[in-house]
Amino acid sequence: MKGICFLCGNYEQLEEHHIFGGARRPISTKYGLTVHLCPWCHRIDADSAHRSGETAELLHRYGQHKAMVEQRWSKEEFIAHFGKNYLDEAEIWGIEHPDDGWDNESAFHLIEEGVLLPF
């Protein structure tokens, strides 16, 4: 399918990337923790999701945020499903206390130099 790559924003033929792969791939699918990436961002480029630990970490952070907001999970509930926490305590506090001025739906967080992800 053609569409906009989640990472680079280019209009390309897209591939589905499971944010949490391996043994956690089925649960990643169950909770909609997938993104559509162009082949470069998915597997070809040195900075792609499958070749760069930094890119994988960025997507893990996005996936945890998405799961915690959509499922209304605590950090502990996320860890029970996915085995690890990827967010810092301030981000977790904001998710777990949505009525305290944190806008989970439209907040943009600077994750890396110049990279904005919608979560």
Where are these regions (language model features)?
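Short, charged/polar surface micro-motifs in flexible loops or helix N-caps
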Residues: 11, 22, 42-44
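Short cysteine-rich loop/turn motifs with clustered Cys
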Residues: 1-15, 40
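Aromatic-residue detector
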Residues: 36-37, 115
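Polybasic, low-complexity binding patches
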Residues: 25-35, 43-109
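Short recognition patches in nucleic-acid-associated and regulatory proteins
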Residues: 13-26
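Cys/His-rich zinc-coordinating "finger/knuckle" motifs
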Residues: 12-16, 45-48
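Short intrinsically disordered terminal tails
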Residues: 1, 110-119
